[in-house]
């Protein structure tokens, strides 16, 4: 997962120089491209961040806020198409900053042809980014040819990071900066009165098993924000065991032998009080019905069932949402009718029948550390359901 991408909320806060191409290009979600004959009033158009040839002391650098904050596993410094003008050396620093203590950073606006102003330097200096931890020391880069354009760096750190400083020495161009890792929420800052999405990928939720992902991975459905298209969801192949002629049961649910499923490890153990299943964009290929179950697994148990391809005794799974009819291109909200809490779970399984696509899954509730502080009575599994039309 690219934690810095603009598609998940990554943002450039500052760059020393953006003369040929702005730093915002670094965090585009698409791959860089090259337009041989395209120029701007400042020079050759390049799909990346490119600074002017430096003629003053120092080096160029930029600061970005991660869209998904958490543990960084590695970087890809992509200099594709920068062959005679790539940055020859790079280093990367990081910090874990509290959002409410950040100084006010001026909005960047249109940057091509410009350098940072004294006011912008003064504002960014309050972050003391010179002192941030080094995740990648100064390292030489390879040119942006097809065989050498991607420069990969592994990171051995378990710390949570919120901001990145990318240093280039002394100047030049970089096409993309990919920051790979896993989300990690600061649960100590969670409002105990407000439910959180315990499966969100931004907080550390992750898919740990699935039956089929022909047209889209289940990790997509726990992504940041709403789905952008059908490609931004989980979609399976059509099951081949469907009967030649389909029939419904007395509740209008299709009578079919097969199903597809995906299992998610929650970002934090907790109880689920609100479920949202969104089939936006899936109009001719939404599932007929679904159900959601939960269980508690230790790390060792999870590793074992992954090896067994999620063959888990049925009694381990506890129902969170019974078999429920779904509608195409629709957001389905399921609210508990009671204030009593359900059992704490670590994993959730979404089952769809017989096949099809889902754009988003939200499992809102309370992390277990907060649940223990709340009164607990006999759990109930009654749900109310509402539908929210997608535009």
Curated annotation (Swiss-Prot):
It holds the Pfam family Allantoicase. InterPro entries: Allantoicase, Allantoicase_dom, Galactose-bd-like_sf. The function of this enzyme is unclear as allantoicase activity is not known to exist in mammals. GO terms for biological process: allantoin catabolic process. This is Probable inactive allantoicase. NCBIfam families: allantoicase. The lineage of its organism: Eukaryota, Metazoa, Chordata, Craniata, Vertebrata. It comes from the Eukaryota. One of its GO terms (molecular function) is allantoicase activity. Belongs to the allantoicase family. Transmembrane segments: none annotated.
